[in-house]
């Protein structure tokens, strides 16, 4: 597959159609462009209670240091980390960077009550693991968070969406919010996340990509 040349200052853009056409489902690898997709969350009115809950959810109370209830859980996490690190090596060649990224994905996924497999699939589709990806509609970072969210539930500084943990926290909290609104329906929740509620291409792409990150332990 041919990729567009990468702009050294800002990520270029591929259309969602071209990104989705590159998916090969059914045990094969899923290939994506080096650029972000064009979907975007839609700003909607939030009840005060919801806004307060989301604001609290993104508050940075602790660094992403995994905690385990027993040795077995810790060993399973370490096995997951090794397996995911091997799969991510082509995208992030440096071990320390891979480790920090995966550790943060795991932490923020668990914190938001999400399956880390789903989160990794979403990141693959949204940004192809590009920290500084920017879409044609302005969504930023790994999880392509729209800047308006920093105003709605953050401090208004959209530049922080290029910070790894901040982006992953916002993304996970927003995804959790959308899934809750859809009563746990992944298809509809993912559609909301992408601003394409009720349409199949995006949810199908994320759920397909998530298969690349399944781990049996």
Task: State where each predicted segment sits.
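Catalytic glycan-binding domains that act on GlcNAc-containing polysaccharides
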Residues: 59-217
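A general, composition-driven signal for non-globular sequence regions
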Residues: 10-15, 22, 45, 68, ...
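N-terminal secretory signal peptides
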Residues: 1-33
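C-terminal segment of N-terminal export signals and the immediately downstream linker at the start
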Residues: 12-15, 31-52, 56
């Amino acid at each position: 597959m041919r990729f567009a040349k990468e702009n050294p200052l800002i990520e270029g853009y591929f259309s969602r159609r071209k990104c989705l056409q590159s998916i090969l489902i059914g045990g094969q690898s899923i290939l994506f462009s080096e650029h972000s997709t064009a979907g975007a969350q839609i700003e909607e009115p939030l009840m005060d209670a919801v806004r307060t809950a989301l604001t609290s959810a993104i508050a940075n109370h602790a660094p992403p240091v995994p905690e385990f209830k027993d040795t077995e859980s810790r060993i399973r996490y370490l096995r997951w980390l090794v397996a995911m690190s091997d799969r991510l090596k082509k995208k992030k060649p440096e071990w320390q960077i891979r480790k920090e990224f995966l550790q943060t994905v795991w932490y923020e996924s668990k914190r938001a009550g999400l399956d880390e497999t789903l989160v990794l699939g979403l990141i693959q589709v949204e940004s192809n693991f590009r920290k500084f990806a920017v879409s044609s509609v302005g969504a930023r970072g790994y999880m392509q968070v729209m800047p308006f969210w920093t105003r709605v539930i953050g401090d208004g500084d959209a530049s922080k969406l290029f910070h790894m943990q901040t982006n992953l926290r916002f993304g996970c909290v927003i995804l959790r919010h959308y899934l809750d609104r859809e009563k746990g329906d992944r298809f509809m929740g993912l559609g909301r996340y992408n601003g394409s509620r009720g349409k199949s291409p995006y949810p199908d792409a994320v759920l397909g990509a998530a298969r690349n990150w399944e781990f049996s332990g």
